[in-house]
Amino acid sequence: MPQHDQLHRYLFENFAVRGELVTVSETLQQILENHDYPQPVKNVLAELLVATSLLTATLKFDGDITVQLQGDGPMSLAVINGNNKQQMRGVARVQGEIPENADLKTLVGNGYVVITITPSEGERYQGVVGLEGDTLAACLEDYFMRSEQLPTRLFIRTGDVDGKPAAGGMLLQIMPAQNAQQDDFDHLATLTETIKTEELLTLPANEVLWRLYHEEEVTVYDPQDVEFKCTCSRERCADALKTLPDEEVDSILAEEGEIDMHCDYCGNHYLFNAMDIAEIRNNASPADPQVH
């Protein structure tokens, strides 16, 4: 049966290595449900969701993280936004035909991975790594080696559970400022690599960890729920309308009678008529409710 959308952190007591395990189903379904993506695009978004959750858990502060793929291929953009509360949303931009068996490089073309970290307090950081690996996991491992000089392995699996899309992943990372041995890390990575997709997506986390590491001493911390959460709102749309020239807004109102602002992440529509626009220009909050 599918597992709850949760992230589990764990630590190897005899090695200076930390780990994470995440499984997502409901969150993934909510990201996909308002779009008719080809299957290869769904798979990439599933992998991005898992990767973003795992990367977010490595942050030691409150803030947001965005992991995006950009390129000149038929999938020009795929992005997941997350935060330290494990609240996620995501979207992809697709143009042209996509083969059923398209791999990552076919989808993205000449491209790169962009990781943007925005602390609630402090400066924003952005890292860019070329799409040189064959998989998203390989690209992100390269990112960690370049940006943090920390040996890191990611193991990402996608599939279906009870006919619904699901995904899971694991992360292993040598802890900074620790005297970890590369041989120990490679040993743990070899064990982790044996995880089967069905096991990761359907078994409780503790059972997965026992199957992989039953000969090791592992401390598992309390899990953290992962959920879909969109940050769009009528107020944000109103703020965006304030930035447009009055002539442009008035022209749309004259042609359409109202302005329909659509959120690509969650599918919500926000409608603004002439009275709403007048209130916005007077710095008043529009009263009309959002329309789904």
From Swiss-Prot:
GO terms for molecular function: protein folding chaperone; unfolded protein binding. GO terms for cellular component: cytoplasm. It is found in: Cytoplasm. GO terms for biological process: protein refolding. Under oxidizing conditions two disulfide bonds are formed involving the reactive cysteines. Under reducing conditions zinc is bound to the reactive cysteines and the protein is inactive. Keywords: Chaperone, Cytoplasm, Disulfide bond, Redox-active center, Stress response, Zinc. Pfam families: HSP33. Disulfide bonds join 230-232, 263-266. Redox regulated molecular chaperone. Protects both thermally unfolding and oxidatively damaged proteins from irreversible aggregation. Plays an important role in the bacterial defense system toward oxidative stress. Belongs to the HSP33 family. NCBIfam families: PRK00114.1. This is 33 kDa chaperonin. It comes from Escherichia fergusonii (strain ATCC 35469 / DSM 13698 / CCUG 18766 / IAM 14443 / JCM 21226 / LMG 7866 / NBRC 102419 / NCTC 12128 / CDC 0568-73).
